[in-house]
């Protein structure tokens, strides 16, 4: 069994309302990191997590213990005890719904002390409302919530995911404007993590890739940036 230094270990709680895709997300990560060859599949029945379960995965030399938590509040004590051992949290939302009770409880439990990331699942559904869900999250919780990616659609059909730090010239006018506005929000949050970056940003200078990465890392660690990523766990 491989032994890891303590500074190379991370406990990550996976939180969210029941049915949002927490377990499927862990299965997708396990498949991507080659822990398993089982491809995540959508079940005909709703799978419920009753107890915390741990899935260890390795990435870039780090060992991540992914802690799957119950989405129903009959098991709230299980979630609280899991959070006490967590270094960070991933809050999973369903793109076809609005903020749910489990989402609210997840934000309540993580508070401001635990670094967090939001994963919006099921963006390939025709019922997905990603943009509206982002606006709802920012209005209800914090303008520190900012997308790192936006889904691209043709009509109601999902086509791709765009990294907002990438060039937008290949996007349609509608999505180019959305990407540029989102990038502006992120860049301001990045600049606010460091006085030197803030001075550089407001003087109109471009931040380097290294400065952007440093700002994102510091911002997440301090709770000044809550990044949003998106995807579909069953499409991996």
Region roles according to the model:
Residues 1-85, 89-92, 99, 147, ...:
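P-loop NTPase switch module centered on the Walker A-proximal segment
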Residues 1-20, 94-235:
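P-loop NTPase catalytic nucleotide-binding module
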Residues 34-35, 39, 87, 111, ...:
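Alpha-helix boundary/interfacial micro-motifs
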């Amino acid at each position: 069994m491989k032994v890891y230094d303590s500074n190379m270990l991370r406990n990550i709680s996976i939180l969210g309302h029941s049915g949002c895709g927490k377990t499927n997300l862990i299965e997708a990560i396990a498949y991507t990191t080659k822990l398993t060859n089982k491809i995540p599949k959508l079940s005909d029945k709703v799978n419920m997590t009753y107890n915390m379960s741990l899935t260890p995965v390795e990435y870039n030399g780090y060992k991540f213990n992914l802690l799957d938590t119950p989405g129903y509040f009959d098991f709230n004590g299980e979630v609280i005890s899991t959070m006490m051992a967590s270094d960070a949290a991933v809050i999973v939302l369903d793109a076809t719904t609005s903020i749910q009770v489990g989402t609210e409880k997840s934000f309540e439990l993580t508070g401001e002390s635990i670094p967090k990331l939001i994963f919006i699942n099921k963006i390939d559904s025709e019922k997905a409302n990603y943009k509206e869900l982002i606006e709802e999250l920012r209005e209800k919780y914090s303008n520190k919530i900012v997308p790192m990616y936006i889904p691209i659609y043709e009509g109601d059909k999902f086509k791709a995911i765009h990294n907002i730090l990438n060039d937008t010239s290949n996007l349609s006018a509608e999505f180019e404007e959305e990407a540029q506005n989102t990038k502006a929000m992120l860049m301001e949050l990045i600049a606010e993590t460091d006085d030197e970056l803030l001075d550089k940003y407001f003087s109109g200078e471009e931040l380097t890739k290294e400065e952007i990465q440093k700002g994102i890392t510091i911002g997440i660690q301090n709770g000044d940036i809550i990044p949003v990523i998106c995807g579909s766990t069953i499409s991996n």
